[in-house]
């Protein structure tokens, strides 16, 4: 994309309403615009990141054997009355009445709707196990929306639901989701720690939240520092293997890690003092097992092997996709701006022309731009007639991992400058070598065209 043809309304000054780094940088980088309290338009740069995160979530869900679908944002209140949650959910639920005087709601979650879909179409244990998921906009009428997309009223979320014949099968689904989430977050350049948590209004006995450690996090957390040394890496997991998924589950949850709602001081005190940590974290996902809570209430049953009807065991699993954008920025920034991990960057690299209008510099930039695009990469070419300092400041603010700087002096020596946003280190090399290096860097990140 050429910057002269792109819509990226960057701000020079820090917005007064922004209280945390991610909110400030998303506004300054022209990623979002607030339309109402806790409700944002996603401008092109922010939308690209949001879509990249969504694609990663889809890829990892499908890898785990989960089936994508799409449910509506509007739901009938009757389903929620059936489960008993319509009155219990509280004022966070936006209740609406249509022209036929029917009670509706803007869905904050989808347990009731997915249970209704399941009971309408599945009647035999032979159709199990089954996990369905979708990625959709949700609405929760927060009393005090704040911190930009971190605590908004409208948010983009992946929620999945598993249906199993037995508790053992459902707990395997729970472990399978934990494994898929670990893969998902690592692909995004995040370390998200699974922590024992409270189930809240969704209910159930087993639940883990995935938290990214950050000073601006709303959750107080207590953990054994050894959990921060755990990485999933590139291990190949058979999601159908109970033993493999259980092994990963135990590896990542046996060490103490809990939110304040479930914190046990006695257990925490048993950790060696030098490994005890108390910090703050940003919740970016949660998994639940809630047994037959919804299937009992809503009659979601299948005919078992013995021919008798039996209520299915269920779980739900969520990832806050829009919140992840803010969480990544909170975890990866400096005083100049955002530092995007290579797996989620909106553009793979930036091209800065130091002398726009110079025939040789323009031609070299055009050639770089065309070559990168031919390899399936997505560069952002700053072709504005702007001073070099302004171009560098823009690139630093929006945080692209790599910048290729092209100027007449370097071209006389047959080189361009390649700079890492993360380290600030630069090297001079021929244009074709810069292209080759960028291509190698992004080879592991599933480059599949431009969004």
Swiss-Prot record:
What EC number(s) does this enzyme carry?
Answer: 6.1.1.15
GO cellular component assignments: cytosol
Cystines in this chain:
none
Give the reaction(s) catalysed: tRNA(Pro) + L-proline + ATP = L-prolyl-tRNA(Pro) + AMP + diphosphate
UniProt keywords (A-Z) are: Aminoacyl-tRNA synthetase, ATP-binding, Cytoplasm, Ligase, Nucleotide-binding, Protein biosynthesis
Question: Which InterPro entries did the record assign?
Answer: aa-tRNA-synt_IIb, aa-tRNA-synth_II, aa-tRNA-synth_II/BPL/LPL, Anticodon-bd, Anticodon-bd_dom_sf, Pro-tRNA-ligase_IIa, Pro-tRNA_synthetase, Prolyl-tRNA_ligase_IIa_type2
GO terms under biological process = prolyl-tRNA aminoacylation
Indicate the quaternary assembly.
Homodimer.
- Role: Catalyzes the attachment of proline to tRNA(Pro) in a two-step reaction: proline is first activated by ATP to form Pro-AMP and then transferred to the acceptor end of tRNA(Pro).
What's this protein's name? Proline--tRNA ligase
């Amino acid at each position: 994309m050429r910057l002269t043809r792109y819509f990226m309304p960057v701000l020079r000054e820090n917005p007064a309403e922004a209280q945390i780094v991610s909110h400030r940088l998303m506004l300054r980088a022209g990623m979002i615009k607030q339309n109402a309290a806790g409700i944002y338009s996603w401008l092109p740069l922010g939308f690209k990141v949001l879509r990249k995160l969504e694609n990663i979530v889809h890829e990892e869900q499908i890898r785990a054997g989960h089936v994508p679908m799409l449910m509506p944002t509007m739901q009938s209140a009757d389903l929620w009355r059936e489960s008993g949650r319509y009155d219990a959910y509280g004022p966070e639920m936006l209740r609406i009445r249509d022209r036929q005087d029917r009670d509706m709601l803007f869905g904050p979650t989808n347990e009731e709707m997915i249970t209704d879909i399941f009971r309408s179409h599945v009647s035999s244990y032979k159709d199990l196990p089954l996990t369905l998921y979708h990625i959709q906009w949700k609405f929760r009428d927060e009393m005090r929306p704040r911190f930009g997309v971190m605590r908004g009223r409208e948010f983009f979320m992946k929620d999945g639901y598993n249906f199993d014949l037995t508790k053992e099968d459902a707990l395997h689904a729970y472990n399978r989701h934990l494994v898929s989430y670990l893969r998902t977050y690592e692909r995004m350049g995040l370390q998200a720690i699974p922590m024992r948590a409270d189930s809240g209004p969704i209910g159930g006995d087993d639940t883990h939240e995935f938290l990214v450690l950050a000073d601006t996090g709303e959750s107080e957390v207590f953990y054994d520092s050894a959990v921060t040394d755990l990485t999933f890496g590139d291990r190949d997991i058979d999601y159908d293997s109970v033993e493999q998924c259980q092994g990963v589950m135990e590896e990542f949850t046996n060490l103490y890690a809990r939110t304040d709602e479930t914190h046990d001081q006695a257990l925490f005190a048993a950790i060696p003092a030098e490994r005890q940590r108390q910090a703050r974290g940003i919740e970016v996902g949660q998994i639940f097992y809630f047994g037959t809570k919804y299937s009992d209430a809503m009659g979601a049953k299948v005919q078992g092997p013995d021919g008798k009807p039996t209520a299915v065991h269920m779980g739900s699993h969520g990832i806050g996709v829009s919140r992840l954008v803010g969480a990544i920025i909170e975890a990866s920034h400096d005083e100049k701006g955002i530092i995007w991990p290579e797996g989620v960057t909106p553009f793979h690299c930036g091209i800065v022309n130091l002398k726009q209008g110079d025939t040789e510099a323009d031609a070299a930039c055009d050639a770089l731009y065309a070559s990168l695009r031919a390899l399936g990469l997505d560069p952002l070419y700053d072709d504005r007639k702007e001073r070099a300092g302004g171009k560098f400041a823009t690139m630093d603010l929006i945080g692209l991992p790599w910048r290729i700087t092209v100027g007449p002096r370097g071209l006389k020596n047959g080189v361009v400058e390649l700079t890492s946003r993360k380290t600030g280190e630069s090297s001079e090399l021929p244009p074709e070598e810069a292209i080759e290096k960028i291509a190698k860097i992004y080879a592991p990140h599933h480059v599949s065209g431009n969004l």
